């Protein structure tokens, strides 16, 4: 660390000593600078030749405090160009450590003082040189403190930036959880209603003529989708039950508020909201794309935002409507479902009744009056 000046690399073309200074003429014109004109190089003091310069350099390099000065200078370079990894910095710390902290410098001074005192005194016989070395170490120490402030500001900025990013990320997590909840809500539809894709066009046409869909518990003669999905409803909000059509009492309102808060934390929509949007979806299967006004009305009815309603219908078209189309294309029985709402085949206008009953499932039939019956 405390290399001699003669051992340091010298570059070709650079002449050291008084000869280099003597090569400049004394009549060099003064060049204006930001702080006034520059003075031409002054001749060396009498008696200061190359031997005198070498002797003074040897005194500086041989001073007891020079190793500490070189160490602080090296720490300044490392603190400027190397990232910090949080490791403690002391004597022998590899490059890239936390070299610009106050604790590191204090440890270096303590270790250096302990090492030097056991060998030789800290000062030389030249008080002027001692003062120069101390001032140089202090200047580098101030430089380290300023670098430490810069690192602290950088750490503070990074911490605040990461905190801001973490505050934004739960939105994506909520959307992902909501997609998972919608997947659980809609998984039972293709399995519980395998014959529904073959007959949904007639159901849509009849209910569009009537202008509404009954969300309450239907009677024996009109047991339909609401009845079946109501029987198969789960805790996640499956089915169209009577809670949509009937008013709630004070206790039920309290339960709904608690359920809404709980579902909000879990990223799942309330049961009432999903029932309303699911009813609209099955009522408009011919064109399951609500307009902006319809989205606004659904948002008011469900208590959700327009963006949440829009995302729910995007997921519903992917997880409900598309599986119904795929199921209809795979089975090939009855009237295949088409997104335009027109039956591809399977019945004619003269047919009074259409019924499909796959093996191992509950059969359902739909007559031309728009009434569902269990087989």
From Swiss-Prot:
Residues 262-324 bind DNA. CDD domains: homeodomain (cd00086). InterPro entries: HD, Homeodomain-like_sf, KN_HD, PKNOX/Meis_N, TALE_homeobox. It comes from the Eukaryota. GO terms for molecular function: DNA-binding transcription activator activity, RNA polymerase II-specific; DNA-binding transcription factor activity, RNA polymerase II-specific; sequence-specific DNA binding; sequence-specific double-stranded DNA binding. It holds the Pfam family Homeobox_KN. It is found in: Nucleus. Residues 25-51, 197-268, 329-348 are annotated as: Disordered. Belongs to the TALE/MEIS homeobox family. PANTHER family: HOMEOBOX PROTEIN TRANSCRIPTION FACTORS (PTHR11850). Transcriptional regulator which directly modulates PDPK1 expression, thus promoting survival of pancreatic beta-cells. Also regulates expression of NDFIP1, BNIP3, and CCNG1. This is Homeobox protein Meis3.
């Amino acid at each position: 660390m405390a290399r001699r000046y003669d051992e340091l690399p010298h570059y070709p073309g650079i002449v050291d000593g008084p000869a280099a200074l003597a090569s400049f003429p004394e009549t060099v014109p003064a060049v204006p600078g930001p702080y006034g004109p520059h003075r031409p190089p002054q001749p060396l003091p009498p008696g200061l030749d190359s031997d005198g310069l070498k002797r003074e350099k040897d005194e500086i390099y041989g001073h007891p405090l020079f190793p500490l000065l070189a160490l602080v200078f090296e720490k300044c370079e490392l603190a400027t160009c190397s990232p910090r990894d949080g490791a403690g910095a002391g004597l022998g710390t590899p490059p890239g450590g936390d070299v610009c902290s106050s604790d590191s410098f204090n440890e270096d001074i303590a270790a250096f003082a302990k090492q030097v005192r056991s060998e030789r005194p800290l000062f030389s016989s030249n008080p002027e040189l001692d003062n120069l070395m101390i001032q140089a170490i202090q200047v580098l120490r101030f430089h380290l403190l300023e670098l430490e402030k810069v690192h602290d500001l950088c750490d503070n900025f990074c911490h605040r930036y990461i905190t801001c990013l973490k505050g934004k990320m739960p939105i994506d997590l909520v959307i992902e959880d909501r997609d998972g909840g919608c997947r659980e809500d809609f998984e039972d539809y293709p399995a519980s209603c395998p014959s529904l894709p073959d007959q949904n066009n007639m159901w849509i046409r009849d209910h569009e003529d009537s202008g509404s869909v009954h969300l309450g518990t239907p009677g024996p003669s009109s047991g339909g989708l609401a009845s079946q999905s109501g029987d198969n409803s789960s805790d996640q909000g499956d089915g169209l039950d009577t809670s949509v059509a009937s008013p709630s009492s004070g206790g039920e309102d309290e339960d709904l508020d608690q359920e809404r808060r709980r579902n909000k934390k879990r990223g799942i929509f309330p049961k009432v909201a999903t029932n309303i949007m699911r009813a609209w979806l099955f009522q408009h299967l011919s064109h399951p794309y609500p307009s902006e006004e319809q989205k606004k009305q659904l948002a008011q009815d469900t208590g959700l935002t327009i963006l949440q309603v829009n995302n729910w219908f995007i997921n519903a078209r992917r997880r409900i409507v598309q599986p119904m189309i795929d199921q209809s294309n795979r089975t090939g029985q009855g009237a295949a479902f088409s997104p335009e709402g027109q039956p591809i085949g399977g019945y004619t206008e003269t047919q009074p009744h259409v019924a499909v009953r796959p093996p191992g499932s509950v059969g359902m039939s739909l007559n031309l009056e728009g009434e569902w019956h269990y087989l």
